Amino acid sequence: MKSYFNEFFWAFHPSIEGFKHCRLVLTIDGTHLYGKYNKIVMIAMGCDRNNQFFPLAFALTDGENVESWGWFLACIRNRVTQMRDLCVISNCYPGIMVVLVDVYLGWSKPNAYHRICMHHLASNFMTHFKDKCLKQLLCRATLETKIEKFNMLMDTIGRINQDTLNWLEAILFEKWALSHDGCQRYDIMTTNMSKVFNSVPKGA
């Protein structure tokens, strides 16, 4: 009888120790494992004080859902770091969004703060509205640091398409707009730190 595992988590001790000296921010993402094994690789990346990528934790799972993301983030909390005030940057995947508001997993306020990747937000935006001009305005609003200028950009978006403004206002500004971030995300606007590892499984 062949045995196999459904899930596997790992984080190296030097990374766990080194993360204590990194910025209080994590980016998380998942990617398919290439080859004969139909698995998902989950990745958590930190950022050191020189703004360099810092690989922290990994997992293999059967798929991306609420249960697998909950398990992965619980492993990080239990095995890797219990630090408070962590900022977690992710895509808009519903499974992640549900897990990060679960008070029992330790990733809701004030233990952690969730922020959305700008690229994923823009991609979801284009799926709904397919307007490159409005997408450019959204990206400008996302990166704007002054609330007054952010409000001006949002007003412009609303004048062009009220449905677009309603869609954006349904998402907490603090999750995607730098002007409302409260200095949680260290100006890191995307999950590119995790994406850079997505090509690694191609050699597995």
Residue ranges of predicted features:
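DNA-binding interface regions
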Residues: 1-204
